[in-house]
Amino acid sequence: MAAVETRVCETDGCSSEAKLQCPTCIKLGIQGSYFCSQECFKGSWATHKLLHKKAKDEKAKREVSSWTVEGDINTDPWAGYRYTGKLRPHYPLMPTRPVPSYIQRPDYADHPLGMSESEQALKGTSQIKLLSSEDIEGMRLVCRLAREVLDIAAGLIKPGVTTEEIDHAVHLACIARNCYPSPLNYYNFPKSCCTSVNEVICHGIPDRRPLQEGDIVNVDITLYRNGYHGDLNETFFVGDVDEGARKLVQTTYECLMQAIDAVKPGVRYRELGNIIQKHAQANGFSVVRSYCGHGIHKLFHTAPNVPHYSKNKAVGVMKAGHVFTIEPMICEGGWQDETWPDGWTAVTRDGKRSAQFEHTLLVTDTGCEILTRRLDSAQPHFMSQF
């Protein structure tokens, strides 16, 4: 850290004289960022690093005028970035959509950095919340509504439709149900759902690229209602797809359901990864390691951490009243990933396709309840696309 003139430390609760400044902030032109010691700087890092992300995002926006575009769409907004596959972003993104003030909002909705202070307060803990009967009813409601919204998105998927159009429909469907779309502004995510096409593993940002015949696309939906989040996703075929896509999507769904079949009190969370990886590898696929399932209720992401790969070190044993997601991401090639310069879009490093399915689950006395299950059918949407 660089030495600076005498100032007061910016760590919450510290009024010591500050002699150091964050070197990254200096490079990015961020004013302030003074600390009294390395210890204070490290203690503030979880919050402070979000300033770096915001500054980089704003810099990228300022560079829009220098883009080379086809018509009004730019498919190469990050000069010099080497894409791992054929997919390209279609920028600029449409403006962030507003949520009416009468809809209850999570704590991060209006935070300038999209930070959830309630999640940060529990970061690092492995204690898993046991939900009360009131909590469980709240989760049942929001998960049912989230399922309704995903089913609406499913009906839109066909060649020529953009993921931006899907996001718009999702946003309106959330509002119509008096729900907040949980992804919106979560650590500054700019849209109301995630749409992940082909080599995108997860957290794809909806844009103006039309879906193409032969694509696969995952739509990830989370709603917030009465203080609770409900989370699910499915992968869909776009028109006719090749046999490799069919096998990948079918196997990914089987990985999820085999893991769900094992959920009951007394099972260690780390066992789920063994089940998922065994089935994926038996079919010639790999399991993403960077992204995991998670606890969910009044917090969007919390304990337990639920890895999908084998021999993981996840902490915790299932008990009746736990609620969490399982959401395996399965790849045609290697499991290694990287992230686009937008800071969100996770893609396979080798450019091969990835698929995902997710449910939110309640552990019961004898097994589990799939809170995000379809009510009109026992099977996911892709099975009706065969």
UniProtKB/Swiss-Prot annotation:
Q: Which GO terms describe its biological process?
A: proteolysis
Q: By what name is this protein known?
A: Methionine aminopeptidase 1
CDD domains recorded: MetAP1
Q: Name one GO cellular component term.
A: cytosol
InterPro entries per record:
Creatinase/aminopeptidase-like, Pept_M24, Pept_M24_MAP, Pept_M24A_MAP1, Zfn-C6H2
Record-annotated residues binding Zn(2+) 4? 231, 294, 327, 358
Species source reads Bos taurus
Q: Might you give the EC number(s) for this enzyme? A: 3.4.11.18
Gene symbol here is METAP1
